[in-house]
């Protein structure tokens, strides 16, 4: 998920009290009440989602495994008065192989009013959370499917960690609406193919906003139409958005705009939609856009969506990497590192999630590990090694080591994020970040950033216009790292990503001899070199092969192992601190 410190779904999350709001008809005659019942708006967590709808990703069923989405066009109108959504979707489906009964995902809380295939009305089956078309789609064929639907969408309990609609109010009482869908999937908002590789090649959005509200969204603004009753329709178009990146944002926004002249020669539109009355704070955040963009373009490569915009919108939830319209809800909090970590983290996802998308939830550490590593790396770029070390240390203390980050099979979102279902949880953020930190030291900056660049762009020489969004896997990254480093590093990824426990460095000192060896889960090979500093001498990199390493040191010398904390490894001190912290939290 986008935000690096999500509450655990297994019981540590903060639950909101149930609140129901209705029209107050206390002064209306009893007969009138009977004729016009009180309308109760849905509470958080309502209407409930079925188990099928909550699943996002996983093994694709036969009725979807050969489907691709060439284009989607959505007409969406949320109504804050009733908290209902009226929608129409036009999907251009393509079959890469014959599909007997093509299926589209859509939450059962929506009523499907009409479905047409290539203009002809059809009656689809509507099993739990799906729309199954009655006719086959031959290999290579395309079909244009139109779906009219409406209903009460699921209201988020605690967005973005529990997805759904957020029907909030601005400080002056006006509607402030947002949606998040990463965890439960795109089907809680629009008819889609709810798996990572279900991205539409192009998405066109038509969002109707109540009078006085604006509707910033993904991609490039095509225009705004004003209806006779004061409502407005906002038209947007985006290239290959992530399935969960399509989002609703409506409020009485004000916008700050500018243009960034990229080092690659292109002009990138900048826009920040914020609530009224927060101009000074909003301009402070907007001032971070250009230097942050410069960092990413220098270190990683060109901003992937420069032909559309760098867009950010203030939201009534913490944040999410909605493509070209990143959700921001950090309330302009200040931090000692001097930049807004939430903005920087979500913006990192434009490279690590939206340009390069993990092909399977099992590979989502490529999103969150890289995006989490970008905050200390940016701090290093701004202030140097000391700030970098401080931020890396804070991440180190969050690593839980409950489960492997990568399991080499197709997983659902819940199987990755929820420890109760075997998931690594927040380790895909912090352990992923530390894995990259150690890898960068092991192979050096040139190889590390070259492999990263090829992972993101699919080529070593990205320039605006010569790349498109792509899918990637952990194995892809391993191959790129091996090619750039000139060595097989499968042992590195097997220990850090495919094992739960951290490697432990065993130190044995006797007289004038220091012996070092590695202990790993399942006795996996781990020939990780180690820096050793003896006395005041500079640290030396010592090879530690399978048989271990023996170093001669003066008997009375002070020895520091890994003095610059290059290597992610078991630490008795960190383990003791984490146990104490947990005892403080639970009162045990």
Regions found by a protein language model. Give the residues of each.
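Hydrophobic helix-coil surface modules that form long, contiguous segments used
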Residues: 87, 181-182, 193-344, 373, ...
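Amphipathic alpha-helical substructures
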Residues: 97, 304, 425-514
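Zinc-dependent metallopeptidase catalytic helix centered on the HExxH motif
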Residues: 290, 327-393, 452
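N-terminal, polar/Ser/Thr-rich
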Residues: 15, 24, 28-86, 113, ...
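Acidic/His/Gly-enriched intrinsically disordered linker/tail segments
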Residues: 239, 368-443, 459-469
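A surface-exposed beta-strand-loop module
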Residues: 107-168, 229-230, 547-555
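Glycine/proline-rich low-complexity spacer/linker segments in large multi-domain proteins
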Residues: 139, 149-203, 256-259, 565-588
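Beta-strand-rich binding/interaction modules
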Residues: 102, 112-117, 216, 489-490, ...
